[in-house]
C-alpha cells in the first residue's frame, strides 16, 4: 500500500514538472519540433539510468523517484501523440523521422550513460 502511495505522489510531481517545463519552453521559443518533450525524456532517461547504476537499496527510491517522479516526467504517451501530429501533418515527414531518431536514440544513450557513471 505504501508503495502505491509513493508511486502516485511521485507520478503527480513528475507530471506537474513536465507540464510546467513544456509550458515555459513553449512560451519562450517557437519551434515546430516538440523540443521540451525531447529534453524531458533525455534528462529523465539519464536520471533513471544514473539511479539504476547506483544500485541504491533504499526502499522508497524505486517507487517514488524512478517509477513515480521520473515515470510521470518522461511520458512516452506525449511522445506518441507528437509523432502522430508530425506524421499526419503535410510536409512534416522529415521532422517525424528526425524527432523519432532523437527521442529513441538520445534517450537510450542518456540512460546508458547514467547507468555507467557508477
UniProtKB/Swiss-Prot annotation:
InterPro entries: FluC (IPR003691)
Residues the entry annotates as binding Na(+): 71, 74
GO biological process, one term: cellular detoxification of fluoride
Annotated transmembrane regions: 1-21, 29-49, 95-115
GO MF, one example: metal ion binding
Any Gene Ontology CC annotation: plasma membrane
A Pfam family reported for this protein in Swiss-Prot or TrEMBL: CRCB
Keyword Membrane: yes
Cell compartment(s), UniProt: Cell membrane
Regulation: Na(+) is not transported, but it plays an essential structural role and its presence is essential for fluoride channel function.
Protein name stated in the entry: Fluoride-specific ion channel FluC 1
Organism, as annotated: Staphylococcus saprophyticus subsp. saprophyticus (strain ATCC 15305 / DSM 20229 / NCIMB 8711 / NCTC 7292 / S-41)
Amino acid at each position: 500500500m505504501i508503495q502505491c502511495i509513493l508511486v502516485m505522489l511521485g507520478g503527480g510531481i513528475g507530471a506537474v514538472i513536465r507540464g510546467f517545463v513544456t509550458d515555459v519552453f513553449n512560451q519562450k521559443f517557437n519551434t515546430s519540433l516538440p523540443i521540451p518533450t525531447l529534453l524531458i525524456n533525455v534528462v529523465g532517461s539519464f536520471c533513471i539510468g544514473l539511479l539504476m547504476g547506483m544500485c541504491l537499496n533504499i526502499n522508497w527510491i524505486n517507487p517514488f523517484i524512478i517509477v513515480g517522479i521520473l515515470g510521470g516526467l518522461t511520458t512516452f504517451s506525449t511522445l506518441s501523440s507528437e509523432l502522430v501530429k508530425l506524421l499526419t501533418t503535410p510536409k512534416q515527414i522529415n521532422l517525424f523521422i528526425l524527432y523519432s531518431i532523437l527521442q529513441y536514440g538520445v534517450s537510450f544513450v542518456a540512460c546508458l550513460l547514467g547507468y555507467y557513471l557508477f
